């Protein structure tokens, strides 16, 4: 359950209904993840990788969406290569989640030695100059960790979120996100609360890759295909008077390290039109994700909206039919 605060911020709040037996399975899962998070990564990561790959074989619908996305985005890759990317994606997912849980339970001082920042000087300069910032963050599996780390260092952070289907998972997940402070804004409340936070000096966290439908989106290139991309970041940077900084986390299950890549601010968007803004957003996703595609959440319906006359790829029966 979520409780509204100050008409804009959402704070997860425990509800007595969470004690009901129907949620015991969820609590068992939470306890298991907490136990895993306290296990040294050199032991847990190989186990989580195997479990993730196994789960990826069972989750046929999620696997199908990922394969469809990859077939359209990387047609030059063989079927075996795309299958391998999906396997590694499912291996990476629980490893990144375990690191997030470890950060929440043990604190940043325990994981900082395993975190490498590339482009940290960009962030430090903006902090020195007291600039407003919106991070453009492709939807990777470790997406929440950089914001939590910055919050743990005293930087005020604000992000938008979708509620989880299970209320216990929703409560725990958002409690973890807020472990070191910051603000969460529900997407169904619109963009205004997020804008207000950025204007007040909170550094924003914006995920650019959700499909918002055709009405306000631009059809622009996305890897080897195209995508309906909402060019909202251009308006946000003007309304918030903020600089847009691309950022992407990469978790390596072999070295047990997290690399956070930070790229130069996208100041070129200030005078750009919507089509150019949308393409630049996708370009930043490509730069980050292209070399490490297993880090990206390919299970999302990224390519749902198509041009008139085209069938949504996830509804095409000829693409990876589930057997």
Curated annotation (Swiss-Prot):
Main subcellular location of this protein, as a coarse class: membrane
GN (gene name): lpxM
Family recorded in the similarity comment: Belongs to the LpxL/LpxM/LpxP family. LpxM subfamily.
Membrane disposition: Single-pass membrane protein
Pfam families for the chain: Lip_A_acyltrans
Placement of sequence motif HXXXXD motif: 139-144
Name the UniProt record assigns to this protein: Lipid A biosynthesis myristoyltransferase
Functional pathway: Glycolipid biosynthesis; KDO(2)-lipid A biosynthesis; KDO(2)-lipid A from CMP-3-deoxy-D-manno-octulosonate and lipid IV(A): step 4/4; Bacterial outer membrane biogenesis; lipopolysaccharide biosynthesis
Domain of life according to the entry: Bacteria
Subcellular location: Cell inner membrane
HAMAP family noted in UniProt: Lipid_A_LpxM
Biological role: Catalyzes the transfer of myristate from myristoyl-[acyl-carrier-protein] (ACP) to Kdo(2)-(lauroyl)-lipid IV(A) to form Kdo(2)-lipid A. Can probably also catalyze the transfer of myristate to Kdo(2)-(palmitoleoyl)-lipid IV(A) to form the cold-adapted Kdo(2)-lipid A. In vitro, can acylate Kdo(2)-lipid IV(A), but acylation of (KDO)2-(lauroyl)-lipid IV(A) is about 100 times faster. In vitro, can use lauroyl-ACP but displays a slight kinetic preference for myristoyl-ACP.
Catalytic activity: alpha-Kdo-(2->4)-alpha-Kdo-(2->6)-(dodecanoyl)-lipid IVA (E. coli) + tetradecanoyl-[ACP] = alpha-Kdo-(2->4)-alpha-Kdo-(2->6)-lipid A (E. coli) + holo-[ACP]; (9Z)-hexadecenoyl-(Kdo)2-lipid IVA (E. coli) + tetradecanoyl-[ACP] = ((9Z)-hexadecenoyl-tetradecanoyl)-(Kdo)2-lipid A + holo-[ACP]
